[in-house]
Amino acid sequence: LFFFLILEIHNAQVTGLDGWDLFIDPGHSQDENMGINGYSEAKEVLQVGLELMNILNSESDIDTVYISRTNDNQSVSLYQRTNYANTVSASWYHSIHSDASSNPSTNRTLLLWGQRNNGEPDPPVGGEEMSSFIIDILTQGMRIETIGSWGDCSFYTWSDYCENSGGPYLYVNRNTNMPSQLSEQGHHSNPAQNQLVMNAEYKRMLAYLFFWSILDYHDIPRPQVGKLAGIISDIESTKKINGATAQVN
């Protein structure tokens, strides 16, 4: 159904991330937030997080990559996640999620960065700028619609939490000591999207979208990509084809 082809292009390790580290937080735990086709948000985002960790460690000179959980059996609280990141003094915190809607046709990306109730970014700043890179690259790579990049207090207008507390709204933005943001990579309540994320290569593609966003934020040239991704369909029936072979000339 989905293919992600890596061409044989050998690149030197990306440099420029030395001295910088990242805390990856795959949202939720175990089998939480079940998708419409039976594949949960928790399992989806864990695999994307692990792929991103592997890409950063193998293809860049990043100092350290931390991750809040490493398997589907762990149950990790919000406090444990943020406390871990604060304890290791991570340079950056990124929380990976997928979204849900009562409308199964809805499928969009969203970035949420820490914001004070007065509209200013929550210090230390950086989440807003990083989110501006991620939202464009993630949306273009997934080829779906987007809600955009928002400060969390501006987004959750139905709640008076920011007004009463000063913000930020999201726990992971409010309780981390480093710049942070949370991403929503489409909707697991969308049948087609939930099926796509069952594919390991699709999740690897999502991880590369985050990797390229990080490089762009740091003004580091991307290596030659050498990757093709897509869904193969029958030209007449438009039905998706499993087990197809793609040839690149």
Predicted segments, located by residue:
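Short amphipathic beta-strand segments in non-cytosolic proteins
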Residues: 244-249
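Solvent-exposed loop/turn segments at secondary-structure junctions
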Residues: 28-31, 71-75, 98-103, 116-120, ...
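Structural motif
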Residues: 222-223, 229-242
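Active-site-adjacent mobile loop/cap segments within catalytic or ligand-binding domains
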Residues: 23, 95-106, 113, 150-222
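Active-site-adjacent substrate-binding region
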Residues: 127-164
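A short, glycine/acidic-enriched catalytic loop
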Residues: 29-40, 100-131
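N-terminal signal peptide c-region/cleavage motif recognized by signal peptidases
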Residues: 6-9
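Active-site histidine-acidic residue metal-binding/catalytic motifs
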Residues: 14-84, 88
